[in-house]
Amino acid sequence: METPLTKNLQPGGIPLPIREFETAGGYQAVRKALGSMKPEDVTETVKQSTLQGRGGAGFPTGLKWSFVPMGEQAPHPKYLVCNADEMEPGTFKDRVLLEGDPHSIIEGMIVSAYAIQADVGYVFLRWEYRLAEERLRRAIAEAYQAGYLGKNILGSGWSFELYLHVSAGRYMCGEETGLLNSLEGKRATPRSKPPYPQVSGLWGKPTIVNNVETLANVPHIVNNGAEWFRGLSRSPDAGTKLYGVSGKVNRPGVWELPMGTTVREILEEHAGGMRPGLKFRGVIPGGASTDFLVEEHLDIPMDFASIQKAGSRLGTGTMIVLDDRTCPVAMVHNLEHFFAQESCGWCTPCREGLPWTEKLLKAIEDGQGDEGDLELLERHSKLLGPGHTFCALAPGAVEPLQSAMRYFREDFERHITGKRCPWR
């Protein structure tokens, strides 16, 4: 099994210095792209690979790039932004690359920027990732010194400047247009689309925003080809995937596995199964803003299409496991509390609706719920769903709540009829 994304990770997590990274094959994709490929060739190769965005939405990466205006009449400067604002609860896969192999992200950004002929790039980093910040700054400086960044890179005539921007620490900055507003020094609220960032993004110029893991895949696709990348997978969704697991399992962590590895294999073979004395009840498969899956779904492949067919989303591919000694009502209340705090307040349903939902869940968890509260929550959740809010924050926030009421309804009812939390 090939693991291109994690092959350079070292014991102890210390990243390779640039010369050792080059010895291991690093920056070969930059030399290949700038030396023997046209920008459109890089985009077409990524298109043929069928690489999908690894930040949650799963949009085809090459197709996204193709929307950027090209040619002599294209507006400049163009921008490439690496979304490293990994704020989704339960998600920590990108941190592994940011801390352990920063040059892989820089190389991915250079090749991707060349494909769209970007002039400037930004790594938009989560505020709490201090170790990643230190290592990225060092790696960027090394890349400049080696001639991979700056003016006339490797004598190609193409120039690319790269900057590290540390977020102020808001979940909303993970939404690409909220991120762009933050980069511009504005309040991190989402923008109306269209126009899309590919046409009018950062400071009104063409901009691509890609996830850390997405960008880290690009050099390997350029070096090895689209067919190779498609062959890494066990499913129609191509490549490998960084899967993460948290919760009461024996070995929580992150693993690079073929896309389409089943939920059961990830949980049992890699995460080591449940801790002694605990039983599996459910799992949120792709970060906190995705629907629960339960035991009947354990043999489903963890890929975009299969998880969607099961009624959830692959999202970030990092799972939060629910065991039989953890209260599902308390777990969902904790998530809704987070989302209510992180609402940007731009639209009324999200600003008012999420705190109201969190308040009602707290009452149920504290044994103060009333008959009819569940029907009220269900009805209210639909009003926070797709088509009712300005962006996807609120619809994502109510996904774990809606699925918890579907799969664990008896637990909610016991809180109301017993006037107490059975787990306390």
Model-identified regions with their sequence ranges:
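Short amphipathic, charge-patterned alpha-helical segments
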Residues: 108-112, 259-276
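Short acidic, glycine/serine/threonine-rich loops at helix termini
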Residues: 57, 62-65, 91-94, 133-138, ...
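Gly-rich Lys/Arg/Thr-decorated short loops/hinges at beta-loop-alpha junctions or inter-strand turns
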Residues: 21-27, 83-94, 197-202, 244-249
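Hydrophobic alpha-helical positions that pack around
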Residues: 133-259, 271
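Histidine-anchored nucleotide/phosphate-binding helix
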Residues: 101-115
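Ferredoxin-type iron-sulfur electron-transfer modules in oxidoreductases and energy-metabolism complexes
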Residues: 29-46, 76-78, 84, 93-98, ...
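Cofactor-/ligand-binding subdomain signature composed of acidic, glycine-rich
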Residues: 1-45
